[in-house]
C-alpha cells in the first residue's frame, strides 16, 4: 500500500492496471521489509548489516508472473525489468513460461551479497544463460560508500539466439572506414 498513491497517479496519465503483490516463484504470502527512509531499498530479504537496516515488516501476497500474464491475457513479446533488492531470481523462477516469450530482461545485479540469501553475480549470469539469455549491455553502476567498490549494475540480457543477436559483426565495412 506504500506505493499505491504513486500507482494511482500514473494510471491517471496512462491506461493500465496494477496488482498489489510481490512477484515471486510461488503464490502465497511473505514478509516484506519496508525501509521508511529509503523505500527503494525495501525487500523480501534481510539486510546483511543487521536488523536496524531492515526497517519494519509487513505481510504481502505473492504472485507468479506466469499467473499474472495468463490471468490478464497479456500479449507477447515481453520486456521484463526486475529490481527487487536481491530477490531477482525468485521473481524469474515464477516466470519460467513468460521467459520463453521474452526478448529483453533488465536486472539489477549485485557484485556483493548485500542481502541475506541474495545470489552473487555469477549465479545471476548462470541462471540467465541456463534460460537462454546472454548479457547485451551493462548500464549504470552504483558504488558502495564503504570503499567506493562497484556494488551493483543494471544488466540488459537478451535471448542468445533472438532478434538482438542476429548479427555478430563488430561493425560494417563502411563503419570501419
Name each region found by the language model.
Residues 1-177:
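Phosphate/nucleotide-binding beta-alpha loop and adjacent structural elements of enzyme active sites
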